[in-house]
Amino acid sequence: MTDADQAREQIREYAVEAALDKLDLDTKARLLSGQDMWSLPAIPEIGLKSLVMSDGPIGVRGVRWTADDPSIALPSPTGLAAAWDPELARRAGRLLAQEARRKGVHVLLAPTVNLHRSPLGGRHFECYSEDPYLTGAVGSGYVNGVQDGGVGTTVKHFVGNDAETERFTVDSVIAPRPLREVYLAPFEAIVANAHPWGIMTAYNRVNGTTMTEHQYLVNEVLRAEWGFDGYNVSDWMAARSTTGDILGGLDVAMPGPQTVYGPALAEAVRAGEVPESAVDTAVRNVLRLAARVGALEGAPAVVEEAPAPIDGQALARELAARGFVLVRNEAVADGSAALPLDAAAGGTVALLGAAARDARVLGGGSAVVFPERIVSPLDGLTSALRDRSGASLTYTIGADPSEELTPADKGFELRAVCRDASGAVVGEGTLPSGQVQWIGDDLPAGASYETMASIEVTGTFLPRENGEHAFGTRGLGAFTLAVGGETVWEGVQEMGNEADPFEAFFGAPSERARVTLTEGEPVEVSLTFQVPDVTALPLKAIMFSLLHLGPQREADELIAEAVEAARAADTAIVVVATTERVESEGFDRKDLALPGRQDDLVRAVAAVNPHTVVVVNAGSPVELPWRDEVAAVLLTWFPGQEGGAALADVLLGDTEPGGRLPTTWPARFADAPVTEVVPTEGRLEYGEGLFIGYRAYEARSIRPAFPFGHGLGYTDWAYESLEATAETVRVRLTNTGARPGREVVQVYLAPVDDGVERPASWLAAFAGVEAGPGESVETEIALPARAFEIWDEEARGWQRIGGTYEVRASHSHGDTRLTATLDLA
Ligand code: BGC
């Protein structure tokens, strides 16, 4: 911080104290409680604006959950981490700050820095890595970037929220060393390196205590030990105890308007259960946030002028390609590598796979944003081949993994009509899809929770195909479904066993009727929902969906068609993907298999076309049992809105695939270090201790499909020299290929016979280098002191472990290029 920055920080602190002095107990308690789904109340008397928060992390959804309010959609966090480039993450953060400012958002509810403990974790795609150091480095870049734009961040979910099953109550049982060395480590690094203005405490418990009430981890570790001075907000609906939460260091209970704070908190102070000073501490943290983001009069915002504009589409495209990981690239008939494709050669490309046309650009749950446009692989390749090469493109579905109904979308034109008990219309609005997601006051003009008795989703559907179309519902309550003017289903959906309050959001779709329709002949559709009485609920919301699934063709027939297309083509590109029902917040995965018949499709195509390139569109690891049978495999994660354009850039060789794996890809699910995420009697034991990710594969001598850090670019690198001290590592390398490229030099430490219980090796540092063909570069990489430390449980402190270490300069965890020996005193 410069002197000028420090002086401004001081002025902000004065403004905060002055504002705090003017507030009475009731107003203070009110400020700590959400006024609605996304904001805190304004307090005009002290010049405080309403602070607005929004998800995060790949875009800024804003306060409305609808495609009517679009946001840029960047690649999934796994893709961002795969770039191994904190500076790039910082640029992503700056773009998101720009989006937040545009939408009047002061605080982004991101980044998610829980770890890839098990590949089953439903929010795996939303977290960065299995490695705490890489997670901390990328997370620091991201936080710095968002805050460079004057917008706050909320590092989440503090801590131990590494899976979704029973997430509201699960007790993550984590021993002190893994807690410190693995799960807390990214949070600690981000607090130290990026000074985040906020943190979100998780739903779960850690070692018996609910995280929103965790005095030790919040007050002692996060605040006293690490010096965190931002605000602490509960995950949505996580705050459950007035006294427990305020004494546990929770500043803000979200969402509102009814929370355990507000009047209940003022009451607890009056009853002598809570000292008023605890309320003051929380208010101070909130006012400090307001001062930083420019929402408190008299306090200079950290960033007063909006930074220079950033081209969102261009950055989204660059980020996507930088995160794509080329895990396999074999030579094909002419002796050259399968990728990049020879754009000048002409010929035919057969593009296959449902996700090539209907791209999966983001993962499900609160990470969902609505981009203004989506470039699918089909869109991206069609225009690139047209503009940049003589090749022709054919497209065939091949296999469709979405066997489940999804919100009515393509071909539907829908609106919502709200009626009162007498049937009179009280409100109306257009709907971008069949999904109704109205939260708080975000209702169609005229409608209110008090007057609405029913909501009809109604309009027309123009079928894209002949045959049996399935219609269905998601949500809880009474429905009537009509197609073509006829009632095809009427019934009530009760709450299932899994009482997740977001059931209507994440719950399984239900098929209700099948109707035979003709391509191009429009038909009327209507789904009427009886509105339950939500007026007494702490959070008023209406969520339900009209679902649809087009005619399903015989899987064998689809594969046979794809095989014909592949046989006739010079190159086959198969896009395989997970679905919304596989990767989402709200539930965990059951296995790592690609859904539907996609594995069969790849095998059948590879059998007839030796130049088969498989593009994997998944946010987390999936099994690739055919990986040795195809010429190339490119992992694209959830690539964000510009994914298809970036894919064309990479396939045609305009851009190098820049990614390295941020997480190990197992050959088969059974090899994953942690294969169970279902708690036993409410407890989830982190029994593997320090051994997650590559640390576990190494300890158990299991060879993964692709190791941590692996990724091929379009050039080769010769590592020439390595010098190591306890502080720095100096590596010299040469680009020996024919193209410019970027290499991620990964530094691992491996202790030699030290008798201390710890992994055989770990990532200590890394750096990206760039060089043209034939050029050499030298990089000096700082080794953080923490890389040599372990947490001493008895002394409750960090202990430096001296002795002999092998220092490795590596292309990946499985590909060490040079080693040096270091004796640490
Ligand atoms: C998620 C948070 C998110 C919040 C608000 C919760 O269900 O766990 O990550 O920020 O909802 O959407």
Predicted regions and their residues:
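Glycoside hydrolase catalytic-domain context in secreted enzymes
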Residues: 1-793, 797-813, 821-824
